[in-house]
Amino acid sequence: MKTPLTEAISAADVRGSYLSNTEMQAVFGRFNRARAGLAAAQAFSNNGKKWAEAAANHVYQKFPYTTQMSGPQYASTPEGKSKCVRDIDHYLRTISYCCVVGGTGPLDEYVVSGLSELNSALGLSPSWYVAALEFVRDNHGLNGDVAGEANIYLNYAINALS
């Protein structure tokens, strides 16, 4: 999994040398942001389920047809609603992993890769998840550097889905 730390080490190893000044700056940058990243990950751990449920309700309000149309990709049944919350929760959990490692590696490997094919095959609209993640970003209640760390990866996921 790619992270700022593994990329710096890999680049130095390929050259057969110690970390360069630029690579050391990347490593120090990660450590400087680590406290905020871990606090953001903790916020996701503490609130992720609640955020996923609130985001799903926002999606149902923004796209009312999702609760009115039948089919496995819609939220017209309790099972459909449960799947929607589960999917949003999966995004949020993966974003929390990004906050821990300080890079987009978890999203790239576990979510973004093959995402459009998966959504297409299942008849899922990326706009539902974009709306859900935007809702979480705009309503998570985090502040300062912690919000900044969370929002980096929320925005990355939103852009990947767009």
Curated annotation (Swiss-Prot):
Topology in the lipid bilayer: Peripheral membrane protein
InterPro entries the UniProt entry points to: Globin-like_sf, Phycobilisome_asu/bsu, Phycobilisome_asu/bsu_sf
Keyword Amino-acid biosynthesis: no
Gene Ontology biological process terms from the UniProt entry: photosynthesis
Localization per Swiss-Prot or TrEMBL: Cellular thylakoid membrane
Cited Pfam families: Phycobilisome
Any one of the GO CC terms: plasma membrane-derived thylakoid membrane
PTM characteristics: Contains one covalently linked bilin chromophore.
Domain of life, source organism: Bacteria
Binding site for (15Z)-phycoviolobilin: C84
Claim: Nucleotidyltransferase is one of the keywords in the record: no
UniProt keyword annotations, A-Z: Antenna complex, Bile pigment, Chromophore, Electron transport, Membrane, Photosynthesis, Phycobilisome, Thylakoid, Transport
Purpose of the protein: Light-harvesting photosynthetic bile pigment-protein from the phycobiliprotein complex.
Subunit structure as annotated in this protein's UniProt entry: Heterodimer of an alpha and a beta chain.
Family recorded in the similarity comment: Belongs to the phycobiliprotein family.
Name of the molecule in the record: Phycoerythrocyanin alpha chain
